[in-house]
Amino acid sequence: YEGADKLYARQMWGSTTRCYDEGVNENGMGAANMERVLDGVLAEAKGKKFIMLGAGQIEYILHNLVSVFDVPGDVIEMGCNIGVTSSYIQRLLRRAKIGKTLHVYDSFEGLPAKTAEDGATPCDKGASAVTEDAFRKTFKDLDLPWPVINKGFFGEIADDNYPSQICFAFFDGDFYGSIMD
């Protein structure tokens, strides 16, 4: 990172570290046990290159998730593609044994149509489409239970399809409309 981005990244990391420490200490599992669980999941990601994730993003997401383990509610991922991030979240939830359920939301039709707010984004409607079967295969291949799968564009999914309490939401929408929905 350079300039203002470097400062912002440093501030975010400091805030995340403080929240993480609080979440680990308050979740009832014990800091040492939680560190072992998290380190085990992160070890599986070490050295792997992910097509849609930059270096360190899985670690960043999982550290943030651990920071809210003491908060009531389930975990949601808005935009799951083939399920790489989802599978790491599910591994952590399963190994931590904290009783939280992962809910994923995706159209499985690729990106929605661009709007004026998206500017010169190079991707068009339908880009990054992955079938629900391909998503499920990611979990099957890893011997992980499937999360609760909700199919549709974000703005079309009924409110009843969301958990009544959410402790962590990972938004992975690519266009303005997706995030605003």
List PLM regions with ranges.
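S-adenosylmethionine/decaboxylated-SAM
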Residues: 18, 23, 30-55, 62, ...
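N-terminal auxiliary segments of SAM/dcSAM-dependent transferases
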Residues: 1-24
